[in-house]
Amino acid sequence: MNSMNQDNRDNVSSSIFWDKCYTENTTGWDLGQVTPVFKDWCDKLVKKSKIFVPGAGNGYDPLYFSKKGHKVLAVDFAEKAVETMNFNANKENLEIDIVKCDLFDLESKYYKKFDYVIEYTCFCAINPKRRKEYVDMMHNLLKDKGELIGLFLPLNKSEDEGG
């Protein structure tokens, strides 16, 4: 692995890196709307649920879930992303918990509180050395019969190559 790859992996663990992405609008993964597969999933949910969205970014998915009556906690550590989520939540008069923090520092008061964790772009952005820690945290947040629902896209790379 070359030093550039290592530098990039170290950068993704920094809120400064992500805040710069949102401030400079270099968020190529951002669809600019709710993720279609999560919209369809949410529209089919019968029971109002408690949903956790890690690395929520601009918040299209958690805001949509809230609009549909679910209790939502959206977490991101990029200041600009959190500002955008709060602005849009206030504009739409939505009840949603938005927390600016490193998800690895999430308080234990949230443990075993969620029916669902929605994973889309957070796991792939985590330094591979911390992915087991991420899995453990998501397990801690889910209720005993809770489910992690995610989109995982194969990159045809090994973990050592950033996959």
Predicted regions and their residues:
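Class I (Rossmann-like) S-adenosyl-L-methionine-dependent methyltransferase catalytic domain
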Residues: N2-F52, G57-Y110, I126-G163
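A conserved beta-strand element that flanks and buttresses the S-adenosyl-L-methionine
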Residues: I118
